[in-house]
């Protein structure tokens, strides 16, 4: 069967169309132009009309260039040699290191059989009190970080990559600014975490098509490591850039647009990636934490809106902090009852008092008279925000719980907290006597 063709029917954006037979959806091809060659993937079949998206872009490609079909879908090497390496969205080295061509695996396969999944039961410690104490990240969970442009969401992901108690970090960047890419790279090296990290990166200067492959490559590699018994944390940023790349391709393909121009299968495409999160019985796990930026801080935007129906909660990053109101880990109750007996009490009591303090902050701003209780709440609010909510705080869960008791004791009497007597007697800080 003929696998090489030398006539391109149409070039539109990053998509080319050829007439070919015996071609499969998702199959790879090499487009050989005059001075270069680019990888392309079949994205549409209409009888003998085959549409391919060119990863390197179509600049310099003419209608007489040669297209050679490879007979397989996209593949990536899988071995421990991936650790500490940086690759682009096609799986090619970006760090100047050698190419890896052994033990190739296909990317983008189906999600694991639900019957093989086990109930989430283990906590992933991050060293961030707003996660560990108040909205615990659970092994095999899928959670987005909802934020807006300008917030330090990549810095938050970086801190989690450096501090999370997992075996392996797979970091996927889509549409990253070059400065952000260098920050990730340099910080992981200085923090000593690059040796347990695999970095797949697509920058804003790269072809938009490569943005689509980053999540699939990251998750396919993660799945193989999880089957080998590794606890893998996949960090993806930014899923809105991923969706925008889908939107651009669908417009080029003249597909009927849906909400705000996004393709009609946006939900399915997002769910397909998030459903890779899993805890294998007798093996490892995949936990997925992503950044989803909200244009105009609009949570009804199609990307965060669809994401919210797929994931098991969300973190809201506002004002450089993880907001306790709106942030939610729906699986936290699976683990926070087995950490320390005061975990849930501290979590509930501190958030309740912080919510009350918001009224006092508003009263003060409007010039109302402040009661002694208001003054206590204001003091508590300041301490809670500086010692618990600040992203620079890095302490173990047990220290964070002890810190919670110290903050409560600094601002309130035991009766004012509403905490049960037995826990007060066990954990309330004892006043030092000289």
Curated annotation (Swiss-Prot):
Q: Which domain of life is it from?
A: Bacteria
Q: Which UniProt keywords apply?
A: ATP synthesis, Hydrogen ion transport, Ion transport, Transport
Q: Its Gene Ontology biological processes?
A: proton motive force-driven plasma membrane ATP synthesis
The record's annotation in Pfam families points to:
ATP-synt_ab, ATP-synt_ab_N, ATP-synt_VA_C
Annotated S-S bridges? none
Instruction: Provide the transmembrane region boundaries.
Output: none
Gene3D superfamilies to which the protein is assigned, alphabetical: 3.40.50.12240
GO molecular function list: ATP binding; proton-transporting ATP synthase activity, rotational mechanism
Q: What does the similarity note say?
A: Belongs to the ATPase alpha/beta chains family.
HAMAP family hit by this protein: ATP_synth_B_arch
Q: What does this protein do?
A: Produces ATP from ADP in the presence of a proton gradient across the membrane. The V-type beta chain is a regulatory subunit.
Q: Would you tell me the protein name for this molecule?
A: V-type ATP synthase beta chain
């Amino acid at each position: 069967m003929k696998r090489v063709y030398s006539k391109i029917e149409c070039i539109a954006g990053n998509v080319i169309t050829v007439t070919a037979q015996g071609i499969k959806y998702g199959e790879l091809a090499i487009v050989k132009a005059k001075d270069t060659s680019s990888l392309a993937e079949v994205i549409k079949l209409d009888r003998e009309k085959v549409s391919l998206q060119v990863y390197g872009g179509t600049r310099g490609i003419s209608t007489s260039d040669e297209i050679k079909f490879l007979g397989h879908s996209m593949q990536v090497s899988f071995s421990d040699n991936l650790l500490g390496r940086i690759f682009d969205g096609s799986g090619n080295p970006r760090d100047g290191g050698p190419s890896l061509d052994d033990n190739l695996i296909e990317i983008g396969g189906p999600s694991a059989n639900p019957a093989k999944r086990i109930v989430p039961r283990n906590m992933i410690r991050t060293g961030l009190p707003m996660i560990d104490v108040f909205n615990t990240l659970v092994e095999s969970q899928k959670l987005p970080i909802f934020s807006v442009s300008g917030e330090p969401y990549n810095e938050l992901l970086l801190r989690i990559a450096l501090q999370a108690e997992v075996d392996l970090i797979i970091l996927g960047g889509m549409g990253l600014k070059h400065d952000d890419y260098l920050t990730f790279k340099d910080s992981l090296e200085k923090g000593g975490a690059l040796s347990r990290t695999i970095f797949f990166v697509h920058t804003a200067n790269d072809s938009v098509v490569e943005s689509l492959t980053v999540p699939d490559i990251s998750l396919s590699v993660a799945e193989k490591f999880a089957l080998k018994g590794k606890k893998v944390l996949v960090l993806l940023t930014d899923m809105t850039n991923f969706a925008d790349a889908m939107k651009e391709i669908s417009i080029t393909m003249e597909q009927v647009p849906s909400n705000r121009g996004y393709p009609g299968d946006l939900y399915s495409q997002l769910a397909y990636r998030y459903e890779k999160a899993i805890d294998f019985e007798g093996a490892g796990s995949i936990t997925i934490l992503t950044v989803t930026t909200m244009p105009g801080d609009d949570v009804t935007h199609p990307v965060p809106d669809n994401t919210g129906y797929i994931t098991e909660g969300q973190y809201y990053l506002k004002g450089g902090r993880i907001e306790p109101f709106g942030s939610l880990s729906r699986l936290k109750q699976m683990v926070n009852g087995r950490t320390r007996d005061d975990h849930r009490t501290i979590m509930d009591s501190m958030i309740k008092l912080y919510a009350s303090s918001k009224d006092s902050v508003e009263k003060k701003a409007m010039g109302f008279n402040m009661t002694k209780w208001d003054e206590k709440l204001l003091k508590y609010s300041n301490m809670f925000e500086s010692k618990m909510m600040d992203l620079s705080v890095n302490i173990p869960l047990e220290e964070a719980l002890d810190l919670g008791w110290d903050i409560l004791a600094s601002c309130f009497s035991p009766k004012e907290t509403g905490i049960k007597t037995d826990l007060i007697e066990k954990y309330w800080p004892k006043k030092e006597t000289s």
